[in-house]
Swiss-Prot record:
PANTHER family: LEUCINE--TRNA LIGASE, MITOCHONDRIAL (PTHR43740:SF2), LEUCYL-TRNA SYNTHETASE (PTHR43740). A motif ('KMSKS' region) lies at residues 624-628. The gene is leuS. One of its GO terms (biological process) is leucyl-tRNA aminoacylation. One of its GO terms (cellular component) is cytosol. This is Leucine--tRNA ligase. ATP binds at K627. Its main location: cytoplasm. A motif ('HIGH' region) lies at residues 43-53. Its EC number is 6.1.1.4.
Length: 873
């Protein structure tokens, strides 16, 4: 064993040895196995790891390593979410085929992951852009299609009129312009493929109650995204006989509806527009088409709209009300039509004031002072009683039994004017992408048969390789006539392939299932294997995936359960959302945009940071690492300077996993010093010649004999108590994922060993051995090297996790606090079995009592057994 800790040498040595040994290979499950499936959200292969990756994967790796040592059969895989727009953009910008760019990045990132000492079973690696994976993505699409859960309909897309192509939302800037051409983006209707996730909305909502191992914050985000609302469906008829159904959560305010508003995309707009209003309506619809849904929904935006020229009849009071169109109403939510109640809805109130529309009060506020709409400065949305509401006058406003909403629904149903309805904010999942680098949709369009699924035996539908990507001219696949032209599988006629590819979220919605049987080329997975390994016991990933990825994965799991492939209905038992990695960040408040952020490398003096261009003083904050802020820390530099084990220890020690972590070079150095200290402790133990003995032979036997005979010295009992306290506390902290306090426990044990003056005792040998075993999940390379130096014949990672001896935790003495008139004045040690009477006697004899009493006799003595004595004078 070398006297000096040399991370590069030992880390590369053990990584190679572990690969050769197959140390991280997933074991076969048996009837006796306790399984544990640990999974990090797999990455997009961008080409290089960032510190957020390192934190995520280190957390999961510690959990996996700990579980292995506890005797679990552990599945801990890694793969690549490899389809997506960045590869296509790289192909356009650099002239590199997306596949080549992607696989180069995968090779680079795989190497980085291996150098971090992450215990992945690389034999189970999957890549979503590989045909042997996307064959089964296509197979799943066909199962959804057969079950009526995949369908095609027209939907609006972002259209670049210059490049003649569809843009993803992230390719449209804040001003509504294309990121590439700069053209103002238009909304166009195209036929798109959808998955019917709304069919599972009620289950997705109800089953959130089963997820006790998920953060409450994530459950709330999913609940809000699904967005269940209970109300009524009411049909308004136009004067020309057209029906306009609306969904409202406030049917009790129907008597206050003074106009209707339709989304500009509503299919009845053209029919309802009178000749006099045709020009204005057409112009407004064109303006609305250029705006994003986020922009249209902004509450602080000035309301715009135009009258269609038509009227509807309010079904509850037969009043004639005008029909408007406005972009704050979205076609994608509800029916695309609303009844506007300006007195009691703020958006409707602002719209009515903007265009001089009538406002009718139907809720009387409880405090009075508001008797008509003229008294309102804003919509009244609080409690009160109904007025001007016909049969519902005087009913208290609320959603409870006997209150206004329930009474209104009951009345509407009695009158045949409406019915109770449950609505969801959740919309069906639009999965079509007019892109090349995605999973082809296995559908053929036949002029005679219509939509025909590709036969399963013809899967996968392979992506063609000879494609020129320009970013212009619509779907790249649609331009490849040789690929598009195909015979109809049903009738043999000339037909055409579907040229859309799938949303990449499809690929990540089932990958965790494939890891159970990743090399199966006959079926998507063996049912016995997937149902044995799943659900995932611990899933780790960023809060940014709290909604879409997790919701889609839950949806897929429930569908596959209903198809008879799975016997569970939730994919992830426990979820840990790790915090962000932040770093010291400099910005100039006198600048704007990207220019305000000053890269760390350009700041000469961190103690007096100044703008390198202007000399102005800079402000300093901690912000999430990013290229735009120039505050990133390259994992490669940390590995080169300190090694993987130090990087892991810092990340785990600096903050609890769910909290944001502030990068600090001094703290990295601190962890490096701690590992050096442990190295020296083991080195000095080994060079004394007792290393091998500590694991086998005399030392262990001698310790057992001394424990059984009760012949341990006080120093040995104290050290053994520290050793077994560390086992207990580190084990408990690991179960709760409190990695920072677990490492603090390792430091306490190291301190106890350093302070113990019994280096030749078998208790000291037990302490050294225990320290190395407890260190193994956190600093795996160093622990392996130290274990071998101590005489280990097998890997430290194949050892049983230490268990503590409860008897060793019992203290010989207890510390008794001495108070005088309730104020702390001192303390003393007493036997652990001290009686209250003896405790009082010892307290009166203590140095603290003698000093403060000065011969006086206390009026009272209060004894808290084995804790304190309070002397009242």
């Amino acid at each position: 064993m070398d006297a000096r800790y040399n991370p590069p040498a030992i880390e590369s040595k053990w990584q190679a040895h572990w690969r050769e040994l197959g140390l991280d290979r997933t074991p076969e499950l048996t009837a006796e196995s306790r399984k544990f499936y640990a999974l990090s959200m797999f990455p997009y292969p961008s080409g290089s790891l960032h510190m957020g990756h390192v934190r995520n994967y280190t957390i999961t790796d510690v959990i996996a390593r700990h579980k292995r040592m506890q005797g679990y059969a552990v599945l801990h895989p890694m793969g690549w979410d490899a389809f997506g727009l960045p590869a296509e953009n790289a192909a356009i910008d650099r002239g590199i085929p997306p596949a080549k760019w992607t696989y180069q990045n995968i090779a680079q990132m795989r190497d980085q992951l291996q150098r971090l000492g992450l215990s992945y079973d690389w034999e189970r690696e999957i890549t979503t852009c590989a045909p042997d994976y996307y064959k089964w993505t296509q197979w799943l699409f066909l199962q959804f299609f057969k079950a009526g859960l995949a369908y095609q309909k027209e939907a609006p897309v972002n259209w670049d009129p210059v490049d003649q192509t569809v843009l993803a939302n992230e390719q449209v800037d804040a001003e509504g312009r294309s990121w590439r051409s700069g053209a103002l983006v238009e909304k166009r209707l195209l036929k798109q493929w959808f998955l019917k996730i709304t069919a599972y909305a009620d289950q997705l909502l109800a089953d959130l109650e089963k997820l006790s191992g998920w953060p409450e914050r994530v459950l709330t985000m999913q609940e809000n995204w699904i967005g269940q609302s209970v109300g009524a469906r009411v049909v308004f008829k136009t004067e020309t006989g057209e029906e306009l159904p609306v969904f409202t959560t406030r049917p009790d305010t129907l008597w206050g509806a003074t106009f209707m508003v339709l989304a500009p995309e509503h299919p009845l707009v053209e029919k309802l527009t009178t000749p006099e209003q045709e020009v204005a309506v057409k112009a407004y619809r064109a303006e609305a088409a250029a705006r994003s849904e986020i922009e249209r929904s902004a509450e602080d935006r000035e309301k715009t709209g135009v009258w269609t020229g038509s009227y509807a009849i309010n079904p509850v009071n037969q009043e004639r009300i005008p029909i408007w169109i406005a972009d704050y109403v979205l076609m994608g939510y509800g029916t695309g039509a609303i009844m506007a109640v300006p007195a009691h809805d703020q958006r409707d109130f602002e719209f009515a004031r903007q265009f001089g529309l009538p406002i009718k009060l139907v809720v009387q506020p409880p405090q009075g002072g508001v008797t008509s709409a003229e008294d309102l400065q804003a919509a009244w949305t609080g409690e009160g009683v109904l007025i001007n509401s016909g049969p519902l006058n005087g009913i208290p406003v609320g959603k409870g039994p006997g209150q206004s909403v329930e009474r209104a629904i009951a009345w509407l149903e009695e009158q045949g004017l409406g019915e109770r309805q449950v609505n969801y904010r959740l919309r069906d999942w639009l999965i079509s992408r007019q892109r090349y680098w995605g999973c082809p949709i296995p559908i053929i369009h036949c002029p005679h048969c219509g939509i025909v699924p590709v036969p399963e035996e013809d899967l996968p539908v392979l992506l063609p390789e000879d494609v020129e990507l320009t970013g212009r001219g619509g779907s790249p696949l649609a331009q490849l006539e040789d690929w598009v032209k195909v015979k109809c599988p049903a009738c043999g006629a000339d037909a055409r392939r579907e040229t859309d590819t799938m949303d990449t979220f499809i690929c990540s919605s089932w990958y965790f299932l494939r890891f159970s049987d990743p090399r199966n080329d006959r079926e998507i997975f063996r049912k016995d294997l997937v149902n044995a390994w799943l659900p995932v016991d611990q899933y780790v990933g960023g809060i940014e995936h709290a909604i879409l990825h997790l919701l889609y994965s839950r949806f897929f799991t429930k569908v596959l359960r209903d198809l008879g492939l799975l016997n569970f209905d939730e994919p992830f038992s426990r979820l840990l959302t790790q915090g962000m990695v932040q770093a010291r960040t400099y910005y100039n408040p006198n600048k704007s945009g990207k220019d305000r952020w000053i890269p760390t490398a350009l700041v000469k003096d961190p103690n007096d940071p100044r703008d390198p261009e202007t000399g102005e003083p800079l402000q300093v904050i901690y912000a999430t690492m990013s290229k735009s802020k120039g505050n990133g820390v390259d994992p490669e530099e940390v590995l080169a300077n300190y090694g993987a084990d130090t990087a892991r220890m810092f990340i785990l020690f600096k903050a609890p996993p769910e909290k944001d972590l502030e990068w600090d070079d001094a703290d990295v150095e601190g962890q490096f010093r701690f590992l050096n200290r442990v190295w020296r402790q083991v080195y000095e133990f080994v060079v004394r010649g007792s290393g091998t003995e500590s694991l086998q032979g005399k030392a262990a036997e001698l310790l057992q004999a001394k424990v059984e005979a009760g012949s341990l010295t006080k120093a040995e009992r104290d050290l053994r108590r520290a050793v077994h306290t560390a086992i207990k506390e580190v084990s408990e902290d690991l179960e709760e994922y409190q990695f920072n306090t677990a490492i603090a426990g390792l430091m306490k044990l190291s301190n106890a060993l350093a302070e113990a003056e019994i280096p030749d005792s078998p208790v000291y040998a037990e302490g050294i051995r225990t320290l190395v075993l407890l260190l193994a999940p956190f600093a795996p390379h160093m622990a392996e090297e130290l274990w071998q130096a101590l005489g280990g014949t097998d890997s430290v990672h194949r050892q049983a996790w230490p268990t503590y001896d409860p008897a060793a935790l019992v203290a010989d003495t207890v510390t008794i606090v001495v108070q005088v008139n309730g104020k702390l004045r001192g303390s003393f040690e007493a036997p652990a079995d001290v009686t209250p009477q003896e405790q009082e006697r010892l307290a009166l004899q203590s140095e603290a009592a003698q000093r403060y009493l000065q011969g006086m006799t206390p009026k009272r003595v209060i004894v808290v057994p084995k804790k304190l004595v309070n002397l009242v004078v």
